Amino acid sequence: VETLKADIDEMARLKINAFHWHLTDYPAWRIQCKKYPVLNDPSKRIQGRDVNGTYSYDQIRDLFRYARERHVQIIPEIDMPGHSTYFKNCFGFPMHDPRGVNILEELLEEFCREIPAEMSPYLHIGADEIRIPNGKQFADRMAAKVKSLGRQPIQWAGNNDLPVSGDSYAQLWNDENSVGLPDPARQKNPYFDSTAGYVNSFDPGILVRRNFFRQPCGTARGNNHSLGVIQCLWPDTRVENKKNIPVQSPQWPAMFAMAERSWKGIPEDGSRFAGSLPEKNTEAYQAFSLFEKRMEALAGSRPFPYWRDSFVEWTVFGPVPQDRQEEVRNNLLAGKSPAGLSPVQTRGGNLYFRTRAGAEGLFSKTKPGNTVWAETTFHSPVEGTMHAMVGFDAPARSTRRCSGVPAAGEWSQCGTRIWVNDKEMKNPQTYKLAGQRRYDKHTWNSPANEMPFDNEEFWWARPPVPFQVKAGENRILIEQPYTGEFQSWGVSFIPVKKAGDRWIADPSYYAKPRREKQDDVSPVP
């Protein structure tokens, strides 16, 4: 509860005014239950998943009051009829069984007696990721029950969810493969937008860009139909140390960008800039660059795995199939332009070729078996050591599908190579999990998902890499093969410097100091 209170403090500071509290899921019913104490029996819960963790009604009321004092409305979710393994463990039948439906109504009654409507005017009933024979009847009955208890029901509204009741608000969602925007005209129910992608699915760069450039709810301004944005974080892989959640899933950088865009709105959608930043000197680029600076200044002491990257410049060559790799590599190292390849000029230290689901990137339609080279040139005033955040893939926190931790001396398990001033450089960092944790398939409902992540599985949670540079111009060439669709294909390279106990971006390698406008601008892509 104390962790949640600290999170609510930060949400209030960002003017985020709602907290969607997911109180039940596969492992357990986390709410104190007086009518059916078996729901709080540790032996009925999924073992290894905080089996003793239950919120008392006193704790729940206390958190509601705490949030309300900070102008944050809690939206509790009691997920039904899916995501409820614990329920069948307790009663021997699923929620959508007639006996289960009766029990659910009693549970809703108890919750609403304990948590009054003036404290909790909304109640989310889940209804996602499940197909049952009586789906519409189930959703309608549960929504009507919530309505009769003086609450506004809310349901998830994805492709594999139960039909949304006419009484409910809809919560639209997508995960890694989310493309396009909600169309307000097609939404029968008032709706929340959760289609920007989950915080647990992406790296820091693309999360910030998605939330900053995307048009919330598919409309320039909110209204009584287009209600607002809810950002989702589902660390489905077992978490051992809860303090690692905001380190492994960059919730605060993503929430900064979500708050910025949700409050200001945007006249036109700029989702195309998530995979590749807008050109320099455009209004959209300048607005994003200024936002990065503000975000860096306001990051504070919270876990904040984001380094502004819009200043990094690239020349990109490719993609080419495997049989041309050596030819192109040799040409680039010799300073020649490879035949038949038109270089692409782009910006952003987080450089995306194809995100894991293919939703974004410079080469989002490219298939595995191809390779891309990224070249960046920068200036160092002196010979010495430059540090940079460097990475090439990372798993979603809901599943382990990923190329894994680099082996000793390697940059990735995908054959990544780096040359500094035409001399190949091996990775100077060695990890305790070197060469491990490679999974080319999803690990949901498998023993692998019960193994907690280590921070070193995420490039943004590792220490920066030292590079030896010369005085004057330096060139770094990165070769990045695409080995399989389990891989998030791209390059992250962001020069950083120490500022107190934190590492912050160091743009001095790319530009001379200059006075920059510090006013507050929203982009018009």
Residue ranges and their predicted role:
Residues 128-205, 211-213:
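C-terminal active-site-proximal or functional interface alpha/beta core segments in diverse enzymes
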